[in-house]
Amino acid sequence: MPRSLKKGPFIDVSLLKKVEKAVKINDKKPLKTWSRRSTVFPNMVGLTISVHNGRHHIPIFITEEMVGHKLGEFSLTRTYRGHTADKKVKKR
């Protein structure tokens, strides 16, 4: 179920402060965040944000197409390595 329109999009306050500061001084260093639930805002376009995936911070360059999505959508938490082959079938 999507978020109510009367509430508006969510962004973590500390992340918003970091973004505003980086935009103000035109800083290009990646911003480190653990807030995967924050929505990408238009003023983030052009910044690099390192989003935590549970193990590492994954750097993500924000583009216009990402606006409105959550940061966690771009930092995958699970790796799929495929199913292992059956050893009995493999020997034939």
Curated annotation (Swiss-Prot):
- GO terms under cellular component: cytoplasm; small ribosomal subunit
The UniProt GO MF terms for this protein read: rRNA binding; structural constituent of ribosome
Q: Which residues form a coiled coil?
A: none
> Which superkingdom, per the lineage?
Bacteria
- A GO biological-process term: translation
Entries under PROSITE patterns matching the protein: RIBOSOMAL_S19
Keywords, alphabetical: Ribonucleoprotein, Ribosomal protein, RNA-binding, rRNA-binding
Q: What NCBIfam families does its record include?
A: rpsS_bact
Family per record: Belongs to the universal ribosomal protein uS19 family.
Task performed by this protein: Protein S19 forms a complex with S13 that binds strongly to the 16S ribosomal RNA.
Name recorded for this polypeptide: Small ribosomal subunit protein uS19
Q: Which organism is it from?
A: Buchnera aphidicola subsp. Schizaphis graminum (strain Sg)
